[in-house]
């Protein structure tokens, strides 16, 4: 990678943050949750205050099944502040957190500070993050181990973003034979590898490739939330290049991705972990995802503005999600996550 491209990567991360602030239509609001109608219980037969939302993830106990999804990598004071606020907020609220892409730290050593977060979140799961396509661009086991080490991570996201790479003029588009390279990383790193999309959804075929590679953790990251394709279009805003706009609604909606994933993982019940993300905006959306089989729910956009503010704002936003999730469980008559999980009887037919 050239110095020019390194600088471009760092600048692009800040461009992404600005685009999220400037364009309300980047949040597509079409993940499919409106298609899921739940059955209200006027006599729920549970004590609200006794509802148990606790769960475990990657060997650590959480207050409820929330993962702060990857938001931003890069370097600079603003990004460092966002990541530290998120990590400290995750620790106080007892939820998991994933960082954004760590690719930049391999070309800009100062970027490591953005990912040195374990001191801020000593007891909750932290996930490192590398773009899977970078395994075809010179990154390998050494870099994956370094990404895990700086974060003292409990797991490693390998993210799949073919659409985002396709609409970037500087994108890395060689996705050939990644399955074998993912398998080698999954075999050789000391923590679980999690395969995730970034907003277009994992299909059953993608999950099958992941399973053959030894992956047991999948984040469907479906369509309907933040459109990275639209962000790339906005970042350039060239009249002769509307590729990102054309593909802004490409992919599997989150609801459909979850429904594909469950049967694909059926043979691995008890050993596989399914994470829902993509347009989850409140605790009711989270409840719907768990009903559809998700073990964890990834949320990013609802926490970004809070993270730009303070740790306290992050904690407040997480507690709001937790209250909404607990209230949905109460109104469905569910006292535990086991009552909610994979329970299609809660969906009105």
From Swiss-Prot:
Residues given in the record as FMN binding sites: 69-72, 101, 129, 196, 226, 279-281, 300-301
Protein name as catalogued: Isopentenyl-diphosphate delta-isomerase
CDD domains from the UniProt entry: IDI-2_FMN (cd02811)
UniProt EC number: 5.3.3.2
Subunit structure: Homooctamer. Dimer of tetramers.
Homology family: Belongs to the IPP isomerase type 2 family.
Alphabetic keyword roster: Cytoplasm, Flavoprotein, FMN, Isomerase, Isoprene biosynthesis, Magnesium, Metal-binding, NADP
Family matches, as InterPro entries: Aldolase_TIM (IPR013785), FMN-dep_DH (IPR000262), IPdP_isomerase (IPR011179)
Function, as annotated: Involved in the biosynthesis of isoprenoids. Catalyzes the 1,3-allylic rearrangement of the homoallylic substrate isopentenyl (IPP) to its allylic isomer, dimethylallyl diphosphate (DMAPP).
A Pfam entry, by short name: FMN_dh
Enzyme class: isomerase
Residues that bind Mg(2+): 165
Cofactor(s) of this protein: FMN; NADPH; Mg(2+)
Residues noted as binding substrate in the record, renumbered to the chain: 12-13, 101-103, 164
Family annotation (PANTHER family): ISOPENTENYL-DIPHOSPHATE DELTA-ISOMERASE (PTHR43665:SF1)
Subcellular location: Cytoplasm
GO CC terms: cytoplasm
Primary localisation category: cytoplasm
Biological-process GO terms, alphabetical: isoprenoid biosynthetic process
